């Protein structure tokens, strides 16, 4: 992989670090230097996991329709008009690889610091474990976007992504196979497991033993390792109880605290510049006369999504709910969960659209177990029903394909806006068909070709293009993805 420039963005504090992040004399091989590098890596992880950086995976699917208010933000994704030379695609690719490069740099310096400061070895090893985790996580995110869904029977032939393990900004690495990519992910997870000793706690802002377990559950499901996916996911239930009230779900998104949260990266008034705002889901202005909001959204949920949220569901309101929308005659439905943390608002009624990235929460673990059980032996109703009843719905007795449909629908209800849908579609092999929200048709953009778009499960453009910059500057890379070779 070829980087656009030198690694930047480390949190230097008071250390003497040059602009290209070279060690400056007395600060070499010290815990305080590695600690500063660690801060920078956490900052980068906060940025790449921010919901503002996940919107394009949502716009690409059948969850949202673009409106005339979008200003074309995300429009190329919504219209499936991606090309290898798109700057947004290059930015996504570069953000992940920049973080990986920072990790590799920090790992080298941490190893050197252990030699020079053996009295700090325990803390430095913990930092190294966190860095291995971050590298595995970044590679996995790249694979989810730029590779096919993992198929154990074909992984040795499926195209992967470069997996740099040394600090070499100019390295020209081949993309390799998807089997090799996941081998690197699992190897880094093992390295993290051996070094991270921080025990899990609700709303942890750091990488913990439990965060690693949650990540293992995600990867195991992706690799069709269903027994381990079930074991990893279910091991987290007791420490992170499901929320079973509407107020509890509101607290998750408005207050940033929840018993379900396994890992949530911290954002404060001083650091919210690390993340972007998810304004286009709402763009609301407070109407003092009525005490309500008038919304001008760039993207609205599709009708089939709105229909999944019934009044008895505690997520109706906090996740998707009724809204007064500018220039439509009847009440519409909007995705409400990312209106922003109250504690980051400048005034009580001014929506800011800044939310702390919730990297792992236990609701996903129930859905992982349900899907893994279904894939393994056709079961899965028990964990699915546990989640449904916690959300105010009735449990399910569905079986067969009807059960799998219920699992899929629950994934939409629970994780709308959080960047899961594209990867779910690929893993399930179901294709997509858009279905415009009836109340909002008059403000939709792109015509029926966009808001009634249909894609078959085998459409190669479910995989995003490799940036042209990478292909042009890395002769060892290999092939462009199938959907973008002409």
How does the language model describe each region?
Residues 1-12:
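Sec-dependent bacterial lipoprotein signal peptides
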Residues 13-61, 305-312, 435-486:
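Membrane-proximal, proline-rich intrinsically disordered regions
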Residues 23-28, 52-70, 147-157, 198-278, ...:
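Short, surface-exposed recognition loops and adjoining beta-strand edges that mediate ligand/DNA contacts
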Residues 73-146, 176, 194-197, 350-357, ...:
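Conserved, well-structured interaction surfaces
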Residues 100-103, 182, 189, 233, ...:
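Inward-facing hydrophobic residues that define packing positions of alpha-helical scaffold repeats
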Residues 184, 228, 379-382:
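Alpha-helical positions within canonical tetratricopeptide repeat
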Residues 223-224, 230-234, 238-350, 355, ...:
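Extended ligand-binding clefts on enzyme/binding-domain cores
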